[in-house]
Amino acid sequence: MTPKRRKILQQILGGLSLSPLATGYLWPTTAHTEETKRNRILVVLELSGGNDGLNTLVPYGNDTYYQYRPNIGIKENEVRKIDDHFGFNPGMSGFEKLYKDGMMAIVHGCGYEQPSFSHFTSMAYWHTAAPNSGERTGWIGRLGNAMVDRVSSTEIINIDSAQSLAVKAEGITPVVFDNPDRFLRKGLFQERQLLNDISRLGACKSEACQFLSDIAVSASEATEIVREAWERYDKSVDYGIAPIDLNKIASLISYGLDTPLYYTSFRNNAFDTHVQQSNLHQRMLTYASDAVAGFFEDMKRLKRENDVVMMIFSEFGRRVPENTSLGTDHGTANHVYIVGKSVRGGHYGTPPRLDDLDEGDNFQFTTDFRRVYATLIENWMGLSESEKILQKKFEKLQIFS
């Protein structure tokens, strides 16, 4: 499909108020062979609500942590220690194994200047990679635009109940779905009927009719491919109690799509732990840890473990001191986790100091989160356009060999 034809189809698709089913055709394709980086996949997992980084990666070697958190601090004998300073929450056996296997890079102190404590605003900053700018497209969307010529299926798949701002783009339309068994066109009844009628017309006598016919066929085929991928998918790998849609992503990778960008989230502000945090937070972390570990076990089974990297983030961390409700309030800097067989595991960036908090008892950020994005864009996806995509040049981290 030519770029012009693709663009017109997308404009018509948007004009008909359909769910964004396809940017072109969702054909399963064989892998590109001319360049290794063309096989590479980036999966982004969002932990919505503001995950408490301090009780996720516990600085058990620092007494100040326990002074700030006398009731909800994770006891040293319960921590899953990964070195002399840090250890994971007791519920995170999956993360512990990934780190000790050398598959996890932990980027400390990720944030931005003039941080917002609003879920909506801070998430928008992370989604757009443009704090305080009013930017309306997402960084994944702009990355997808830069990769249009690399793939023959859709550039971005967003598994969620609604499209994330992170994947919003100009010129391409991500595939967005939630349940593979109920992946349907969501337009008005008359519009759905129109496309169904057009798809049965056969030969079209006008270019406009042919465009609409292409849309109808593409939408129908996208629906069938998502369903068929899920039905064919070998669900033998254990993702734990809550797979967080990572098994759905695995099903599409298994099916053979050459889609390079996937985005999903642990939804509904699940990590917003203001009250009675300890048990709830550990349970949420167990779900996430088990699901991520299961996903990479699945990639190993599919022989794609060298092709896939996952970024895990939250819109902000939590305030350092516990509150009077045995929870934590909205904070600032947090960890970002980069996971994959191709990752150089270890610690990156400077951990914020517990004895140098801001006036609100929050961490001072030490790593601009867009350094992580720039690293993934250039050193993983193999594009040189990170400055254009991020609208500024950022120093990269040495996460990849």
List the predicted regions and their residue ranges.
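Conserved H-loop
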Residues: E305
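Acidic/histidine-rich, metal-coordinating catalytic segments
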Residues: V309-F316
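C-terminal, helix-dominated tail/subdomain
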Residues: S325-V336
